[in-house]
Curated annotation (Swiss-Prot):
Signal peptide annotation: 1-25
Key words, A-Z: Glycoprotein, Host-virus interaction, Membrane, Signal, Transmembrane, Transmembrane helix, Viral attachment to host cell, Viral envelope protein, Virion, Virus entry into host cell
PTM annotation, UniProt: Glycosylated by host. Glycosylation is crucial for glycoprotein export at the cell surface.
Assembly notes: Homotrimer. Interacts with matrix protein.
Name by which UniProt lists this protein: Glycoprotein
Origin species: Snakehead rhabdovirus
Length: 512
């Protein structure tokens, strides 16, 4: 259906959808080839990775001790192009969220004395305090006096004259601090008419009372201009971040444009305000208008935000090493432990799944996950494509993703306590490559050491019985054994050695 043939209601819906799509579209910037530079800075990891394509012919059984935790890359700029740019950023501090302006409330009053004199010289004196109108210019030009004590003037009295006035004008000045709206650069106070004022002096709800600020217009925080780089994707040319040496990176994947201090700024992913002027001759970058007027003003609290991905990497590697130690020691694995070996970076990586109680390992292409559907059956990658999760040939998901018929997203759900119980049920591995030393601690902290082979404890000479062997031999053999035992009883028996033969461990190549 073409646009001219659409009904009016459908046209309105189409325009609303088009406007929403345009407002959320990400800004692209294709730098000139001569402006591209080599630059290296670390960047955030994706929230989750999953295999999108696996090479099934590469999967083979792997022994538990041969498992390896994924490599953590230092450079996260694969697939990005860097170009020089001039970056202006506003020096916002946490206290700027309560930016205040000093001033005073100015009140003009008149102290009046009225005198009336009668025929016989009697006097009537009346004293009044009157509200006196005051103009903007008068309020702005008034200079505050440290100490000004009001008083009534001496009465002026004349015979047979009534209401002779003697007046004196005073200005009452009271210190008053108001809030500054850094978006519109206006003074904000409930005392003002309309709740705000663009320029001092500001009229108040009280008659003839003005608020006078130390400066006519609110001041804005300082602006720093530095040379930096902007990063764009090589394939889509979408802007991902801006970097200035000595400052944390500014993410621009969800950036938008906002008016702040009567100027247009780019609000970054985490709420900072910057402006970007590329050095390749193009104009300043403009982005879609923000849907709200919120600036987080993180300030110095976020100077270490660029270390977030490093902290996440260390935590993931520690969890992986603990999972590896547990699998090797117990010769058991659960989907939860297997999920710790998932690579945190997109690209070629090792994937694992369970098949017939054996860990299978092979090569897969991992991609970043940007969003997960409500029923968790599909996901959206960084390119905006909705796809289904890749499952192994046995129906189990890679990296411990599928438990029965339920899709479990490791790492994204572990802090929400919605893991299925099946994620934590350990499965005994069918193939045990070598004996393992298992140390158990009881309540008295004593240590019992045993050798496990195929899950059975080898007790040398302990709880051993002859009956299974005697049941299958002849009577003559039994009599011969009794005779030999009678002869051996005359010799003093030596103490049995119940120690564990260490050659058993050595001959099998135990790795401790």
């Amino acid at each position: 259906m073409t646009l001219p043939n659409m009904k009016p209601k459908r046209i309105v819906l189409f325009l609303v959808f088009l406007n929403a799509w345009v407002s959320n579209a990400q800004v692209t910037h294709k730098p000139r080839p001569d402006s591209i530079v080599e630059y290296s800075e670390e960047w955030e990891n994706p929230i989750y990775t999953t295999p999108s394509h696996c090479f099934e012919d590469t999967f083979a059984p792997v022994k538990p001790e041969k498992l390896r935790c994924p490599h953590i890359f230092d450079d996260q700029n694969l697939g990005l192009t860097a170009s020089k740019a001039k970056i202006l950023h506003m020096d916002l501090k946490p206290e700027d969220t309560h930016f205040e302006a000093k001033g005073r409330l100015l009140h003009k009053v008149t102290y009046q004395v009225l005198c009336s004199t009668g025929f016989f010289g009697g006097r009537t004196v009346t004293r009044k305090v009157l509200e006196t109108p005051m103009g903007d210019n008068e309020a702005q030009a008034y200079k505050a006096v440290d100490r000004e004590f009001p008083y009534f003037p001496e009465p002026l009295c004349f015979w047979l004259r009534d209401n002779v006035a003697a007046e004196r004008v005073f200005h009452f000045s009271t210190p008053k601090t108001v809030t500054v709206d850094l978006y519109s650069r206006k003074y904000i106070s409930p005392d003002f008419v309309g709740g705000q004022c663009a320029k001092s002096p500001c009229p108040t709800h009280w008659p003839n009372v003005y608020w006078v600020g130390e400066t006519q217009s609110p001041e804005c925080p300082s602006i720093d201009t530095e040379g930096g780089h902007i990063f764009t994707k090589k394939d889509t040319h979408r802007i991902t971040k801006a970097v200035v040496h000595g400052h944390h990176p500014w993410g621009l994947t969800k950036a938008c444009q906002i008016q702040f201090c009567n100027e247009q700024w780019i609000r970054t992913d985490l709420g900072d305000l910057i402006r970007i002027e590329p050095n390749d001759g193009t104009s300043s970058l403009t982005l879609p208008k923000c849907q709200d007027n919120v600036v987080q003003m993180r300030g110095n609290l976020d100077d270490f935000s660029y270390l977030n991905h490093a902290i996440v990497n260390m935590a993931q590697r520690s969890e992986c090493l603990e999972a590896h130690s547990s699998i090797v020691a117990q010769q058991k694995v659960s989907p939860y432990l297997l999920s710790k070996f998932r690579p945190p970076h997109p690209g070629l990586g090792k994937a694992h799944y369970l098949q017939n109680n054996t860990i299978m390992r092979g090569d897969c292409i991992y991609e970043g996950v940007a969003e997960i559907s409500e029923n968790r059956t599909t996901y959206r990658n960084l390119k905006g494509e909705w796809k289904k999760w890749s499952l192994s040939r046995g129906g189990e998901g890679y990296d411990g993703m599928t438990v029965g018929t339920k899709i479990v997203i490791p790492d994204l759900e572990k802090y929400q306590s919605i893991y299925d119980n099946g994620m934590f049920i350990p499965k005994l591995l069918g193939e045990v490559p070598h004996p393992s030393i298992v140390i158990t601690y009881n309540q008295t902290d004593s240590i019992e050491t045993g050798i496990f082979t195929d899950g059975k404890l080898l007790n040398m000479g302990v709880n051993w019985t002859l009956w299974p062997s005697l049941s299958g031999i002849s009577l003559f053999t039994v009599a011969s054994l009794i005779l030999i035992w009678y002869c051996c009883c005359r010799v003093t028996p030596q103490a049995l050695n119940y120690s564990i033969p260490m050659h058993t461990i050595t001959s099998r190549g135990v790795e401790i």
